UniProtKB/Swiss-Prot annotation:
Consists of 3 domains; the N-terminus binds the ribosome, the middle domain has PPIase activity, while the C-terminus has intrinsic chaperone activity on its own. GO terms for biological process: 'de novo' cotranslational protein folding; cell division; chaperone-mediated protein folding; protein transport; protein unfolding. The gene is tig. PROSITE patterns: FKBP_PPIASE. It comes from Legionella pneumophila (strain Lens). Belongs to the FKBP-type PPIase family. Tig subfamily. Its main location: cytoplasm. HAMAP family: Trigger_factor_Tig. Keywords: Cell cycle, Cell division, Chaperone, Cytoplasm, Isomerase, Rotamase. It catalyses: [protein]-peptidylproline (omega=180) = [protein]-peptidylproline (omega=0). Involved in protein export. Acts as a chaperone by maintaining the newly synthesized protein in an open conformation. Functions as a peptidyl-prolyl cis-trans isomerase. This is Trigger factor. Gene3D superfamilies: 3.10.50.40, Trigger factor ribosome-binding domain, Trigger factor, C-terminal domain.
């Protein structure tokens, strides 16, 4: 067998394999002889079919079969000998074997990039730190009170904070548009759940008195046919309700499964939950910052095949989020634009390649104690922690998920050792609600 390797553009390689005709003909003849011993053809007894008859009828199909299997065996051998690791499935051609000629084929594919990890070498990395304040707990209590308001009907004009039940119909250029109408729709005025101007336009309205309001859809609105356009909504208020905040007493605490200690126990429970979620978010953000820093000093050529594969995964994820279920094998995924996923796919591929090399270089292995500690941390948030522990330990797949998270933490810790760390204080809202929060000054 002869093998040649040609370097094409970037990571692309072209491997040419030539198998001697003697080996090909020997394999084809062997299979035809075996076939002759068991094939059934009208007019001949089983096993008594003349070889030339078998050859004339089955030679082409046997050659195709030999070609496919020879590609599998010889290409694997060629890749091993030349230390080539394909990043995607090779494109092979041709697969035909001509009698009396060497079987020659080419395989074109991208190889996995070979690179050495560059360390940070005390490069500065800014991480964040945060804690739950008394004010944060009080704000959460107020949100819970808002969510548990007692609503009663009123007859006064609508004011901010009221809940209304409305019928509405939207128009573009005096024509109704799809998805622009509803009946019996509940809306808290000031909640910001509708497009800008819609809720403000209802303030001052009264029951059964028609309203016409003009609003403009945001330029970045999800439906392109509505984005940036002015619409008119005809609204009828069917009901107006005023909310009353519940008192901060034991009855309120009991709504959140607090049996003893009243509001103080509720605050303690809320603080613990907030602190747990804050710690998780801060750790995640700091991990990302450390990974981004390592990627910034490690420029890796990315195989297009891996990017394409990751884009397909992201498309599947989006389909799942949009439609709430996995698509069936015969169900066509909508043709989402590639540019929606390309940057994220490139980042994932870059990080995945770098992560694997970093783990190999530093011989990082998931620590069993850390795996068990992470499971204990997850379990502590549940009413029946032992059940959750048993759930993880009952499946290799479940344990592998935890091990992967532990590996991420261990890699991040190792990267941090080689960096010059600075810390920035951020308040709770800045971390948990980045679009709403504000940064605190300080180191």
């Amino acid at each position: 067998m002869q093998v040649s390797v040609e370097t094409l553009e970037g990571l692309e390689r072209k491997v040419t394999v030539s198998v001697p005709t003697e080996k090909v003909e020997e394999e084809v003849s062997s299979r035809l002889r075996n076939l002759a011993r068991k094939v059934k053809i009208d007019g001949f007894r089983p096993g008594k079919v003349p070889f030339n008859v078998v050859k004339s009828r089955f030679s082409d199909s046997v050659r195709e079969e030999v070609a496919r299997e020879m590609v599998q065996s010889t290409l694997y051998e060629a890749l091993q000998k030349n230390e080539l690791v394909p990043a995607g499935y090779p494109h092979v051609e041709p697969l035909e074997i001509e009698p009396g000629k060497d079987f020659k084929y080419t395989a074109v594919f991208e190889v996995m990039p070979v690179f050495e990890v560059v360390e940070l070498n005390q490069a500065p990395v800014e991480l964040i730190q945060s804690e739950v304040s008394d004010k944060d707990v009080d704000n959460m209590i107020e949100k819970l009170r808002e969510q548990n308001k007692e609503w009663h009907e009123v007859t006064h004009a609508v004011k901010k904070g009221d809940k209304v039940v409305i019928d509405f119909q939207g128009f573009l250029d005096d024509k109704p548009f799809q998805g622009g109408s509803a009946e019996g729709y509940e809306l808290v005025i000031g909640s910001g759940s509708m497009i800008p101007g819609f809720e403000d336009g209802i303030i001052g309205g009264k029951i059964d008195k028609p309203l016409d309001i003009k609003v403009s859809f945001p330029e970045d609105y999800g439906h392109k046919d509505l984005a940036g356009k002015e619409a008119t909504f005809k609204i009828t208020i069917k009901k107006i309700m005023e909310g009353k905040l519940p008192a901060l007493d034991e009855a309120f605490a009991e709504k959140f499964n607090i049996k003893e200690g009243g509001i103080e126990s509720l605050k303690k429970d809320i603080r613990e939950n907030m602190a747990r979620e804050l710690e998780r978010r801060v750790n995640m953000m700091n991990r990302e910052k450390l990974f981004d820093s390592l990627m910034s000093v490690n420029h890796v050529e990315l195989p297009i095949a891996l990017i394409d594969k990751e884009i397909e995964h992201l498309k599947h994820d989006m389909y799942h989020r949009l439609f709430g279920h996995e698509h069936k094998d015969d169900e066509k995924i909508p043709d989402f634009p590639r540019e929606l996923f390309e940057e994220q796919a490139k980042r994932r591929v870059h990080l995945g390649l770098l992560f694997a090399e970093y783990v190999k270089k530093h011989e990082i292995v998931a620590d069993n104690d850390k795996v068990n500690a992470m499971i204990d941390k997850f379990a502590s948030a549940y009413e029946s922690p032992d059940e959750l522990r048993a759930w993880y330990q009952s499946s290799k797949e479940h344990m592998a998920e935890v091990e992967a998270l532990v590996m991420e933490d261990m890699v991040a810790d190792k990267i941090a050792e080689d960096a010059k760390l600075k810390y920035k204080n951020m308040d709770y809202d800045s971390v948990m609600n980045p679009k709403k929060g504000t940064e605190k000054k300080g180191e």
